[in-house]
Structures are given as C-alpha cells and as structure tokens.
Amino acid sequence: MSVPLILTILAGAATFIGAFLGVLGQKPSNRLLAFSLGFAAGIMLLISLMEMLPAALAAEGMSPVLGYGMFIFGLLGYFGLDRMLPHAHPQDLMQKSVQPLPKSIKRTAILLTLGISLHNFPEGIATFVTASSNLELGFGIALAVALHNIPEGLAVAGPVYAATGSKRTAILWAGISGLAEILGGVLAWLILGSMISPVVMAAIMAAVAGIMVALSVDELMPLAKEIDPNNNPSYGVLCGMSVMGFSLVLLQTAGIG
C-alpha cells in the first residue's frame, strides 16, 4: 500500500476520534474546537498558496494560463458544489440551545452526514494527489484534514446518539463521512496510479490548491467563528501557518523538502 493512500486513510479515520468523543460525552471545549479549525485553515492556506500553486506553475510544460486557470477552476468548483449540497453544517448540531425532538435530530444528522460525505469525497482525492506529488506537502494536508474531521465526527455522533441511544449507530453514521474521504483516496489510487503525466499532475495540484483555499475561507474559518464567537479564529490560522512554515523550513534545511 502506498504512503499517500495511507495518509488519506489516516486523515479520514480521524472522523472516528470525534465520533467516540461524541458518544462518550467528553466534548472538547468550543474554544479548542475553534482553534483547531483555524489551525487547519492556516495549514491549508500556507501549503496551497506558498507550496502547491508555485510548484504547479513551475512544473515542466505547465503554462501560467493553465496553472492559474486550474486554480480558479478549483475555487469555483468548490463553491458550485457547496451550493448544490445539503446546507447542514456541524455548528447546526453542536450549538442547539433548545433540544429538538429525537426524530428531528436524527433527520438533521442524516442530512449533515450526507453533506459531509459528499464534501469529504474530493478531500480524499486532494490528499492523495498532493501526497503523490510531494510527500512533504501530503503530510501537511493530511494533518489539516484530520484536524477538521474530528469536530465533524463529533457533530454527527452526538446528536445521533441522543436520538437513538445507540453508540454503535452513532459511530456508524459518523464513520460514513470519514469512509467517503477514504473512498475518494482509494479511487484516486486506482484510477491515477502512475499513469499520469507531470503536466496533468501539476494541473490537478493547482485545482486542489484552489479547493483548499476555498475550503479554508468559506468553511473552516467561518465555522470556527460560529463555534466560538468570543475568540478570533485568526489566532489559530496564524499558529497553523507558523507551525507549518517552520516545519517546511526545517525539512528543506535538512534536505528532505
């Protein structure tokens, strides 16, 4: 099994961490969840804009028009899919001040699971493609994806457990969204494999960079602010950028990057 595929599987499996937290009743503080989402956004933004897009543009045979065009395509593609998907977000379930009826919770959780699954599928592809092109960047993307998968698993498992009283059912529903990400990585592994030219890989990387930027500014940062409105998610973003940037410098200094 390839290392990029293993990274994708581990990132998707992080959903189960949130699921177990949801059924065990040990919910992390909103401040910690918000910081982790901002941290993940910072990692994604720095890797996308400072590493992935420049690397794609520098690839042999890649034209600036194609490179920037694929980046814009990734941005617009994300926003297009976001408008088409069911608009239930983790904060819709994590911040209920009045406890809804069990059936209402279950229905909302199912819609949320569907939306997150469709949203996670291309993330699995993105993680695999990035790690296949550059393993160093793949580690960073996998870490960022794993960090924001934890509150997603928590957001689904908690309400389903409240509605059904079954820990197994709650973990199952939460795990579906994580499995969708793993499925995306497996399909990318089966379809792409080694039969892809450097230009095509660079074009895909540019599109993935656009998707990651859109995900960070449209989903992760607003979600962090909604989960913890009393604190600025920018602190998490800055920390994520700083840690990722410092680690990249260390790797490059050591001759690994």
Curated annotation (Swiss-Prot):
Keywords: Cadmium, Cell inner membrane, Cell membrane, Cobalt, Cobalt transport, Ion transport, Iron, Iron transport, Manganese, Membrane, Metal-binding, Transmembrane, Transmembrane helix, Transport, Zinc, Zinc transport. Coiled coil: none annotated. Its main location: membrane. Changing residue 152 to A: Binds Zn(2+) and Cd(2+) but with a 10-fold lower affinity. Retains binding of Fe(2+) at the high affinity M2 site, but loses Fe(2+) at the M1 site. Strong decrease in Zn(2+) uptake, but slight increase in Fe(2+) uptake. Changing residue 120 to A: Binds Zn(2+) and Cd(2+), but eliminates the second Fe(2+) binding at the M2 site. Slight decrease in Zn(2+) uptake. GO terms for biological process: cobalt ion transport; iron ion import across plasma membrane; zinc ion import across plasma membrane; zinc ion transmembrane transport; zinc ion transport. One of its GO terms (molecular function) is zinc ion transmembrane transporter activity. Changing residue 148 to Q: Binds Zn(2+) and Cd(2+), and maintains both Fe(2+) binding sites. Decreases Zn(2+) uptake but does not affect Fe(2+) uptake. Pfam families: Zip (PF02535). Zn(2+) binds at residues 123, 148, 152. It catalyses: Zn(2+)(in) = Zn(2+)(out); Cd(2+)(in) = Cd(2+)(out); Co(2+)(in) = Co(2+)(out); Fe(2+)(in) = Fe(2+)(out). Uptake of metal ions is decreased in the presence of the ionophores FCCP or CCCP, but no clear contribution of the proton-motive force could be demonstrated. Bicarbonate or other ions do not influence metal-uptake. Changing residue 82 to A: No change in activity. NCBIfam families: PRK04201.1. Homodimer. Contains an asymmetric binuclear metal center in the transmembrane domain: one metal-binding site, M1, binds zinc, cadmium, and iron, while the other, M2, binds iron only and with higher affinity than M1. Zinc is transported from M1, while iron is transported from M2. Iron transport from M2 does not inhibit the zinc transport activity but slightly stimulates it. Mediates zinc uptake. Has broad metal specificity and can also mediate the uptake of cadmium, cobalt, iron, manganese and possibly copper. Has a slight preference for zinc. This is Zinc transporter ZupT. It comes from Escherichia coli (strain K12).
